UniProtKB/Swiss-Prot annotation:
Function (record text): Arginine-containing cyclodipeptide synthase; part of the cluster that mediates the biosynthesis of a highly modified cyclo-arginine-proline dipeptide (cRP). Within the pathway, amaA acts as the scaffold-generating enzyme and is responsible for formation of the cyclo-Arg-Pro diketopiperazine (cRW) from L-arginyl-tRNA(Arg) + L-prolyl-tRNA(Pro). Additional enzymes from the cluster then further modify the cyclo-Arg-Pro diketopiperazine (cRW) scaffold.
Annotated catalysed reactions: L-prolyl-tRNA(Pro) + L-arginyl-tRNA(Arg) = cyclo(L-arginyl-L-prolyl) + tRNA(Pro) + tRNA(Arg) + 2 H(+)
Presence of keyword Transcription regulation: no
Keyword terms: Ligase
Name of the gene: amaA
Pathway membership, UniProt: Secondary metabolite biosynthesis
Placement of sequence motif Conserved DDXXE motif: 445-449
Disulfide bonds: none
Similarity section: Belongs to the arginine-containing cyclodipeptide synthase family.
Protein name, as recorded: Arginine-containing cyclodipeptide synthase amaA
Amino acid sequence: MVSISKSLVADICVGSSPPTVRFVTLLENHDISNTTFPSLSGVLAQYGSSLQGPAGLQHVGLAQDQKYQHALTKGLKAVEKLQHFLDGPAPMSGDPVVLRCSSARSSTLLEITDETITSGPPCAGAAREREGITSFHRMKFHLPKHVGCVQDVHETSSQMLHLSCDGLRSEDTLFDRFGRWSRDHVTIVSGMCLFSDKIMRDAVQGDGKLDVSKLSSQEPTLYELEIIARSSSAIADVASHILGKNGAAKPIPLEIVLDAPSWHYFQVVHGNLASGHCTPAEALDWLQAVELRCEQVTTVFENSVRHEMGLRGVPAGFYHILAAPGTAGVGTSIRQALTSGMVPDIADCMDAICEVEGERWAMFYSLIPEKDRPCDFRSLGNLFYIYEVVRPALAAKNGSTAAELEVSGPNSALDDSSSSGHSDILDSALHLKANVERPLIMSIDDRAERKIYSKAQAFIKKIRRAPQIPSHPLLLELYSARRVFINGNTGGDSLYWNDSSPHPLRMNTTAGSPELEAFGVIRNLYGNDCAQNLQRWFSEAGVNVSGHT
């Protein structure tokens, strides 16, 4: 099991030559009764339920004290809702059937500890300013000793998580006192990027020519390794917790969707192709290198999730893992155009989506105002990230045609401005629907991707109010605490935009100081087993790891 019980984080100094890395412990000294002071700008690590006055915030400025306190209180209330939602209510009678169901559902329990990391933008204009101030609370998952046929199971695992969900009410639970599920199926969605920003930029030369070798021979980047290690553990904890509640009731269907971009990156080279700086054949080679990396990374991601699920005693047959199921049509359309020596057209891609995705896409597209519909590959790629999140909520049951859905348009009952957040209106809309599906969607991702899920949340609200869509979904946004910071977090930058891979890091700038490659950083953060497994899985997927031992 990937262990993140120790709050060890890496701080990479990219401004030094060569880049260096240090490891900072945030929440490990339990002798401290209230607050610790990590040397990371805008980051407050603490024990206890409240901040201990302005003295504890000297590293972010006294003016931030009230904002941090508010974020901590709001975050705690949110995870308390999550705890109640996942663990459910106590039995209300002495009926043996009720007690038996309750006992089965109590096989996994969720505990909120008093360890918290509250982080915010270190200064005005910082990269993370749009994320606001966020509190991550350590949640301990108490797992059953025996699940299915596997007996050697770790009993506890913990995650530093933040929950965002306007639609989750304090009284909501995943199942009632009689063991009946309140949701029809569960989908856990998680995503990641490919390579790093630097590598993607280096693959396009200054004159617009493409250098495919920068992609095809690339070793795993620290970003890719870290996001897989962090996300896999969180996915497995949440999924095994839910599946552990099956008990005597009918098991709830659970899918895990792993969304890594492929054709989404075509927007990087589309302009070069259209202006004649590269040929369709060169663009095709470039795209195929990206698609191969997507396939390889997704395979490793899936292996990591399955490994973590196995450590928690969950048999493979209890869940399904899908790789971005809604994206196939676009990639095929782009490749066909390039193979024919043509510049791909977004209209052809839209036709391909309609053909492959059918009513799901028609329902989704009907919710988009005309002015917000995609007009180029960049906007289409951004839209598809959102579509993959809400896709599980778009299963049609009432036989509505695409034309009927389009007529309704994104207005009237779908307008967020007048009724956002009013559960009575949502419930009224639900009452008008027939054969309603009640899917639960849980996203698990880095906080830097919040924009995607915030927009997906807006679509979820529209779906719940749309009488023509037979679905009443709930989206819970879970974010895991960052484990790698850049330059002491002085700019709030993320690893993807500052990853120096494949170049190794050094422990200090002294000549001859020890080098630490990407797998070494993972070994320090997540343990030797995690690093070895990732190295083996990447090698089996065909990614070069020859430079690592």
